[in-house]
């Protein structure tokens, strides 16, 4: 099964404290639709990020370049037989996310550096990723994991997420390990607001009502040890 998806939207990030997060959850669960993945306390998101030999994607983000990208494998269950292979590109205020659903066997080959497996998928996006990853010497760099609560509004493809318990590992990149040892990254909670074109007024009012500070912080960059050097 190879499913492809493309999403283009505005993404804004904020840092909030645990008390604000609790208050916001109470409001959102009454006014918006909960994501189908949500459990009582949200769901796990685990990603394996790839970067170039010299960490160009990391430094492009840190330097605030207008055009930058991230490549990752993503799963919501380490035991899952399918994963998302994603390319996120930032162009001004817009984020473009291209994704493929791929079998675990192909994901494992990518982790091992066998990017030629992408050529076997007969998919334009996979061919594009092959060229990027092979030409720029991409390597798996870092596992990033956190807990997510997500709420949606169908109009304008609006999605609000509350991410907490951010953890990472650069020494062990076994994305399939259910008992993976991870290091805490931050105690902060990240609020993300994603939408097409404009934010509906009642959703904007909810976001405006909470204490927050806008940030451009990337979970990937926060999770890399080189960010502390």
Where are the predicted features?
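Phosphate-end processing signature that detects enzymes handling 5′-triphosphorylated RNA
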Residues: 1-229
């Amino acid at each position: 099964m190879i499913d492809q998806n493309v999403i283009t939207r505005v993404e804004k990030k904020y840092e909030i404290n645990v008390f604000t997060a609790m208050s916001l959850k109470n409001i959102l669960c009454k006014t918006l639709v909960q994501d189908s993945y949500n459990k009582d306390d949200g769901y796990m998101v685990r990603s394996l990020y790839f970067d170039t030999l010299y960490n160009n994607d990391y430094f492009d983000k840190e330097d605030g370049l207008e055009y930058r990208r991230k490549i990752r494998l993503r799963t919501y269950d380490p035991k899952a037989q399918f994963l998302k292979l994603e390319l996120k590109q930032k162009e001004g205020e817009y984020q473009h996310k291209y994704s493929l659903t791929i079998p675990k066997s192909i994901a494992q080959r990518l982790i091992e550096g066998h990017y030629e497996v992408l050529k076997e998928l007969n998919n334009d996006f996979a061919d594009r990723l092959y060229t990027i990853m092979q030409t720029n010497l991409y390597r798996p760099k870092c596992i990033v994991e956190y807990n997510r609560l997500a709420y949606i509004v169908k109009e304008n493809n609006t999605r609000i997420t509350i991410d907490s318990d951010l953890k990472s590992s650069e020494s062990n990149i076994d994305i399939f390990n259910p008992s993976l040892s991870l290091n805490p990254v931050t105690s902060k909670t990240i609020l993300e607001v994603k939408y097409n074109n404009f934010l509906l007024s009642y959703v904007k009012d909810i976001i405006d009502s909470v204490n927050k500070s806008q940030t451009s912080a990337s979970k990937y960059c926060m999770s890399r040890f080189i960010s502390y050097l």
